[in-house]
Amino acid sequence: ADWEKLVEGAGIIGDSELIIDDTPGISISELRSKCRKYKLEHDLKLVIIDYLQLMTGSGRSTDSRQQEISDISRSLKALARELNVPVVALSQLSRAVEQRPDHRPMLSDLRESGAIEQDADVVMFIYRDDYYNKDTELKGISEIIIAKQRNGPIGTVNLAWLPEYTKFANLEH
């Protein structure tokens, strides 16, 4: 039964218009060009960047890495507006989160740029207490921390974490 589900799922993905572009160190201008092309040819509906710090900026040698990340962040926001599609960008956190007793990430932990926080409409973090505390009573529970939401409330949502499937699920009550 599991094999049949796997084959069925692979078929669904294969028949979809999912495009995976794993160009290493893609520049923001190259991404913009590809997204415009995909929008015309495939009616692009979503862009996911995994992850922001692997991209390169405009290539100006005078820019610091922080300035380069700021330019990338701003350009992704402009791309979302231009193509009218959501852009989801994963970002690395600074090491500061590891230094605190409470390891829940905060907006100030976004690595290399305050511009990410400023440009984003929504910022969400994942926190699992069992990652840091092996004896926790919260085993298998993930906190989805909505730290910023331009047009809505912030807060935390608890979900079940199913590592054997790399999946989040609603908690059973």
Spans of model-derived segments:
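Conserved Walker B
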Residues: 52
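Flexible beta-alpha connector loops of hexameric P-loop NTPases
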Residues: 1, 17-25, 56-70, 97-108
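Phosphate-binding/switch region of NTP-binding enzymes
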Residues: 67-173
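Cytosolic-facing regulatory segments adjacent to core modules
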Residues: 1-43, 57, 157-160
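Amphipathic, alpha-helical segments enriched in basic
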Residues: 3-6, 10-13, 62-63, 91, ...
